[in-house]
């Protein structure tokens, strides 16, 4: 007998909204999809759908189904935190990192703990971090009333008088601040694809970049020129693509953090113009660097 699965909205539905479910029927390695319209169901409360022998997960119909939803993605951001994870209650990557590609500081240690692990590996990029920060800042700037306060700055449960999205913005900006330790000194990337050695928790990282297992990762200095550690060069042509993200995040971040974290707000506000000026002096794009498999 073919397997049947019903997919419904995990969030739920407004009473007067259109409502659809997808019936997935699988047989011999092939899936067929059928869409069902149940918009006539408007009764508030928890429901399930039954189609043939298949039964859906429970879903909610309510006028308040979207209440608090703006805070939900922050669970993912907290889960991705590097340095200390509030979900697991443990630390990781406490010895990051060691500078590479800097004309005078290569091999020196720099404290760049924090930020978020990127995707499903442990790599960290200033460009994706900047994108994540700016999207959160833009959402908060336009709709501050939608965000609650249920977590501490470190991501553990408990209100602290600061909107949770501001705490998460601060977590990201603190890392970008560390990745820009001095005027004209910007870093683009922490770790590289030597990380891709199998699934494990960040605290159990077995990657060795030359300083011993889980004993610090490389931090790539922004040169605006091609870089590589392995098979092929990237094609970086300048700095503006990355330092522009620093500039925009620092400028808007300074404004958003000022009521809550004035010291960090002032520091990054002063750094914003330096980032902008470097982009003007050396226009072009900065790509990330890979070692094992150029991408």
Predicted regions and their residues:
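Surface-exposed beta-strand edges and their flanking turn/coil or helix-capping segments
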Residues: 20-23, 50-51, 71-76, 201-203
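Generic alpha-helical propensity signal that fires on short helical segments
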Residues: 24-31, 77-79, 150, 204
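Low-complexity, Pro/Ser/Thr- and charge-rich linker/hinge segments at domain boundaries
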Residues: 56-91
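Extended ligand-binding groove/face enriched in aromatic
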Residues: 78-128, 155-249, 260, 266-277, ...
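Well-ordered alpha-helical scaffold segments within catalytic/enzyme domains
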Residues: 21, 51, 122, 133-155, ...
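Ligand-binding face of N-terminal immunoglobulin V-set domains in extracellular IgSF glycoproteins
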Residues: 3-66
